[in-house]
């Protein structure tokens, strides 16, 4: 029996078919590999959810303010590193029960909700002396200031433990007699600031919380002393008006350290000086090539009772 022989033409066809098949397999495999690569690109939420515990910090109960409104709680982190005199004043008045029952007398949509006046008309205050302004501070006085880029209003934009801030160029230090380079809190939604009259040193007890972006009108003119870290939706429910027809009252204000341990807020903030935060900003498209699109659209992620909030 003769062994069948294949012609050279048939052999060439077979080899060609094998090559095409091999190429097809390679293309398909490459496509699957590309798909796999796309699948492993983490979303902003995945980046935050996989951040190690070492990159989260718990709020200090002594510098955590709980503001109770009819709509619910607002949790505020006080920042004595940014405005020590104003934080001390707020804590003193809170512990006196001064704010309990007072109403928000001036609430402007897209701007501020102002309260803390016992007269309810914007002319009152406490019996304590007025405060000197703390509109800005030297960047070197900040324990942490992480620059994430620049924007249309400031050469340096960043965060100090979650608080949005702007600053002058560091290069100015060598040209100034006092060797200071200034940083200030940006008046973005959620920032807590102190109201005053025309005189810079007239702040006393009245405060306002930001419900809009007012950087151009308030930055470096008013002292910011805290940041809402949870419950901002309740701030949005404060009745509008100058004054409102039905002013929203402060039910009570408390310092978390004065509350029973099991009633204290459970809020953690992502460290803005860690490795995770810049990755999150880039992946979310909030900072591109060193340009910050809108600092007021960025907030440090939180974990509230273990649940992540972006």
Language model regions located:
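Cyclophilin-like peptidyl-prolyl cis-trans isomerases
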Residues: 2, 30-310
